[in-house]
């Protein structure tokens, strides 16, 4: 890391929580989400002239196979701290994905979702993957926390699908939603920010999404997630009471927060979410 960047990072940490303990935090987002369904879909996008190779998320972000998880767990158990404990990965998880065939049958007017564990069953390449999730949790080296119900702005996505926009419809037909203008200029909307609105009508819908997401999380993992990290670090403070009602106590993320003021066009930037401080609603950063 360049010296200037190192100094900047250290300065940002000064107002936050401090400890003399040597703590290493390992966390990773987007577990459970369909971004690139398969190598075959990736190659089909390229064949159609959609440059998914320009976006690292499209190139590398996919559901983890049993082999992927085994390799990860091998690394985690290869090291121990001074107390003899193995490394632990916090897996920030979206618990659901769209059910494409049902959405299409509704002429793109209704949204349906399924637990990501059902998505895993749709391809033999994920055989045994869910069992590895459970083994990692049982071993205490893999700890999911809530990233959202799905990594998707449902309202915006359905609206664009109804309009017939070419690349978004193509990606839908290929079983994904995670393309941005980085891969094709015809894409005018980014659907990855699940909470990218500050409108009251959308906040009410987000309350449902958060509640259903936490309920599904508890059903899958056997406990409620105490922390939450918003997709794309974007959320309105208006959703925080819903998080609290659903058992969330902590907000993961960066020092900065992108706060939508309307329907995903105007934003305010908050840059003081320091570790150990609290939001106005009472959640701890």
Summary of predicted features, one role per range:
Residues 2-227, 233-282:
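Catalytic alpha-helical scaffold of carbohydrate-active enzymes acting on polysaccharides/glycoconjugates
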